[in-house]
Amino acid sequence: MKAEIHPDYHTIKVVMTDGTEYLTRSTWGKDGDTMNLDIDSKSHPAWTGGSQQILDRGGRVSRFQKKFSGFLKKG
């Protein structure tokens, strides 16, 4: 293997949407950084059976729906 080509692998803290925290190893950020999740297994409809709404951060979903609202309409 070539030396010096792999990213630094270090410990970070992950904070889930309900406030639960855990430590894991990652190449994201720097050693000791905190990653705050917007969506996780406790809030994503794929794991909750669709009972939760996904938070539309920054209006991305709204812009997408507006842009493609008439895409499949017959006319």
Curated annotation (Swiss-Prot):
Top-level taxon of the source organism: Bacteria
GO terms, biological process: translation
A GO CC term assigned to this protein in UniProt: ribosome
Gene3D superfamilies: Ribosomal protein L31
Protein family (similarity comment): Belongs to the bacterial ribosomal protein bL31 family. Type A subfamily.
Quaternary structure, from the entry: Part of the 50S ribosomal subunit.
Function (record text): Binds the 23S rRNA.
Protein name (database record): Large ribosomal subunit protein bL31
Organism: Nitrobacter winogradskyi (strain ATCC 25391 / DSM 10237 / CIP 104748 / NCIMB 11846 / Nb-255)
